[in-house]
């Protein structure tokens, strides 16, 4: 009996040692992959640098903690006190992330400086067969401020969340395309510039014709492939309301063979035209929101075709091809 216990103990010890060695090797790979982001050019791919990078979570997780994080993408420079990403060893396709605020955002081209603060900010993404099964990000007590000269609050909300869901019935293995449904919600939003307070907003979207492998997202031919697959952005619903105003919109947009947007967006509103008067003067306000009806509500349809945005048949803006 004693000999069996010794053998069992030896086996357990060997497993622990082997697993510890494997974890150390894998943690080194994780560290190396994150460190490689510091060598990106910040143009074709974002550059991430960490003041301090630590990998923890032994034995069943990999927790990557990046303090004093700095992200460069084009003209935008983003700085955060800390970022954390975690993956369970037995569920490597499920990533959890969180961030410490506030986040400083600088545009090196325009010189603008903004800050986004929060009390909690967390995200998760789960993959299934390299498709996004679900992705979410949620923030609490968000405050967006202009910090170029002092600090001026632009907008704030106690809760904002974004969710993406796979639409399994629209997955086409033959054409290698997938579809995502998106849901964005913000509650009790305050935007002093538009005299908005206690505003609730919801956005529901569906995007079809996406590559069914996220590793192919961002490829140079992604948009042409989406167009060839008859991909479409369905604006299922945009709904915003506060004590005196409502705004609703829906429609669909796609790409034509030249990479130009085509489709329609229908907008109905009450109390919005008066609210955005200082930002959108006539005749543009009427061209976007439409003329008031007998009940005081506004309705209009924006058409997208041949590289133009039209209010009815009147061109109001131009959009270049997307590919």
Each language-model region and where it sits:
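Short, hydrophobic/aromatic-rich segments at coil-to-beta transitions
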Residues: 63, 94-95, 133-136, 177-183, ...
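Extended lipid/amphipathic-ligand handling interfaces
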Residues: 53-55, 80-91, 116-131, 152-174, ...
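N-terminal beta-strand/beta-hairpin edge segment
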Residues: 43-172, 187
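Hydrophobic membrane-insertion alpha-helices, especially the h-region
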Residues: 6-23
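Alpha-helical transmembrane signal-anchor/signal-peptide segments
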Residues: 25-44
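Extended terminal
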Residues: 2-10, 51-52, 221-228, 238-241, ...
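Flexible, membrane-facing loop/turn or short amphipathic-helix motifs
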Residues: 68-77, 103-115, 141-155, 171, ...
């Amino acid at each position: 009996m004693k000999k069996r216990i010794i053998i069992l103990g030896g086996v357990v010890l060997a497993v622990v040692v082997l697993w510890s060695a494997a974890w150390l090797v894998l943690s080194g790979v994780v560290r190396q992959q994150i460190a490689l982001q510091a060598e990106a050019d910040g143009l074709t791919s974002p550059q991430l640098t960490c003041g301090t990078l630590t990998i923890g979570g032994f034995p069943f997780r990999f927790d990557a903690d990046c303090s004093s994080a700095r992200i460069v993408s084009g003209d935008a420079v983003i700085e955060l006190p800390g970022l954390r990403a975690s993956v369970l060893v037995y569920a490597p396709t499920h990533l959890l992330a969180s961030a410490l605020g506030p986040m400083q955002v600088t545009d090196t081209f325009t010189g603008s400086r903004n800050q986004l603060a929060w009390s909690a900010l967390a995200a998760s993404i789960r993959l299934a067969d390299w498709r996004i099964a679900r992705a979410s990000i949620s923030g609490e007590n968000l405050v967006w401020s202009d910090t170029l000269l002092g600090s001026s609050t632009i907008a704030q909300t106690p809760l904002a969340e974004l969710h993406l869901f796979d639409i399994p019935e629209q997955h086409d293995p033959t054409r290698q395309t997938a579809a995502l449904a998106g849901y964005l919600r913000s509650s009790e939003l305050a935007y002093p510039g538009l005299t908005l307070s206690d505003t609730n907003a919801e956005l529901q979207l569906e995007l079809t014709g996406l590559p069914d492998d996220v590793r192919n997202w961002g490829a140079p031919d992604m948009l042409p492939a989406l167009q060839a697959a008859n991909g479409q952005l369905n604006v299922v619903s945009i709904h915003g309301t506060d004590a005196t105003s409502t705004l609703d919109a829906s429609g669909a947009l796609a790409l034509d063979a030249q990479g130009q947007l085509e489709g329609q967006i229908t907008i109905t509103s009450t109390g919005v035209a008066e609210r955005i008067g200082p930002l959108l003067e006539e005749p543009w306000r009427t061209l976007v929101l439409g003329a008031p009806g007998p009940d005081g509500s506004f309705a209009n349809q924006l058409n997208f075709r041949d590289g133009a945005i039209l209010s009815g048949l009147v061109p109001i803006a131009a959009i270049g091809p997307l590919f």
